[in-house]
Amino acid sequence: MSSKQISIVLLIVLSVTACIFSSNNKDEQAIAKKVANILDQMTLAEKVGQMTQIDMRLLDDPSDIKTYHIGSILSGGGAVPESNTPLGWLEMVNGFQKVAMENRLAIPLIYGVDAVHGHNNVLGATVFPHNLALGAANDADLVYRINKATATEVAATGIHWTFSPCITVPQDPRWGRFYEGFGQSTELVNGLTAAAVKGYQAQLSKTNGKQVAACAKHFIGDGATVWGTGTRVDGLHTYYIDRGDVQLDDKTLREMYLPPYETAIAADVKTIMVSFNSVRGEKCHGSKYLLNELLKDALGFKGFVVSDWAGIDEIPGDYKSDVINGVNAGIDMVMVPGIMEGQNQQHYKVFIQYLIEAVNEGSVSMARIDDAVSRILKVKLEIGLFDNPYIDDA
């Protein structure tokens, strides 16, 4: 190839790259403009509602979605529609969405589910091996194809968000959730993370351009807790290692557990879930250093941070201080999720009341609320929810 031909090829490559970069910039600018426009119209109550996630079983009434401007509904373990079929799920999610769209600003719900090895809550869905088995295969293309297939089935049931992939680096096989990770090697987990995220978030056919959002979890150190440091949770039981304390120094924690998150963020993961555990005695759900300074500032994460199931409840202090400390630490959406029999959890209406009070009292700044809601709206726009809030049953 002559120098002239090489120059032409380079010029074409640079032109295409510039076009893609320009297009991406325009998309980002357009979304940012839409977010700002919506945010300017929102009341404090509407903003707090967007930061609230409720389990579908724990809604007092579906009309509360409209009344309290709820931003997200989830199906926790065992939370299934009366007809546990793909059509049953689709009709349930579309029904909740219809109520949300009756709000004056018509901000759609983002519905979440633990589709962690296939769409495993739905009878008849394809079930794949857990991550530990996929880590043993160590085949990034296989992980991508499995997660894209899972996302296809998730989207077909009207759902927009899977609480996966789990990118922990588990060390102690006595931990009951060990199988959720790809393996004990940071290099192995890191090597499969991009494929896992991109598979879930691949553009799908037959969804009118709508995309499923992935959720990297659990930030951070959930596979490194020390045996005997587990948390006692009222209404549940005492854990020996789960929800325990990570006692690694900061350098080791960063070297072992940050690389997969850096990779997930580079792959444009839309959401990240906080871990139940503590790091050197401080609950991750209440750590401004971990969630704000490290995850958002240092790593540059631009999506939104979601708590785990009633995760803020385990921050020391009463529930109102839990709300204040969790949101100020950097949690954008709180999985409340509501009052469940036999568990000591708070009602979503209490969460909403306390967060509104905290803003009015100055304990949580409006800037923090606006940042959280902007991130949530941004993700909803990016995955196409505003354009196509429903999936039809075709």
PLM segments and residue spans:
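Bacterial Sec-dependent N-terminal signal peptides
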Residues: M1-E28
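Glycoside hydrolase catalytic-domain context in secreted enzymes
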Residues: A18-A394
